[in-house]
């Protein structure tokens, strides 16, 4: 699940949507036997946002025979309300209420030493 943006930005040429799909494709190449979907979360207001929506996808998966879900939010560096509440709490509840059986979430990188080392390297390259 990636943080969504209003569709009008995509329509105007914002590359974010493409970055998300490329990230998912690259992850999928590492796990050929696992079905991986790109979805977008955190929409609000009346305008159209990038689809498919994470909440609607989680609701529909059990009826498609998918009873086990492992979620990851690669667009988030650190866990926050969008990952912990929106996905791990609300998303899990919704998935289970619609007939799912097992739901888990890979935590964001947070303060993992490899993450901090990567950030240090990126900062050093750019200063």
Labelled PLM ranges:
Residues 1-127:
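Extended amphipathic ligand-handling, pore-lining, and cofactor/metal-binding catalytic surfaces
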């Amino acid at each position: 699940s990636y943080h969504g943006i209003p569709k009008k930005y995509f329509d105007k040429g914002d590359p974010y949507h493409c970055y998300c799909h490329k990230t998912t494709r690259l992850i999928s190449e590492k796990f050929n036997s696992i079905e991986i979907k790109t979805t977008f979360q955190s929409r609000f207001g009346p305008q159209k946002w990038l689809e498919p929506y994470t909440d609607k996808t989680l609701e529909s998966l059990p009826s498609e025979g998918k009873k086990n879900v492992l979620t990851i939010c690669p667009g988030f560096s650190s866990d926050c309300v969008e990952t912990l509440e929106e996905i791990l709490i609300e998303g899990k509840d919704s998935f289970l209420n619609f007939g799912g059986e097992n739901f888990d979430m890979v935590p964001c990188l947070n303060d993992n030493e490899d993450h901090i080392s990567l950030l240090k390297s990126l900062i050093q390259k750019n200063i």
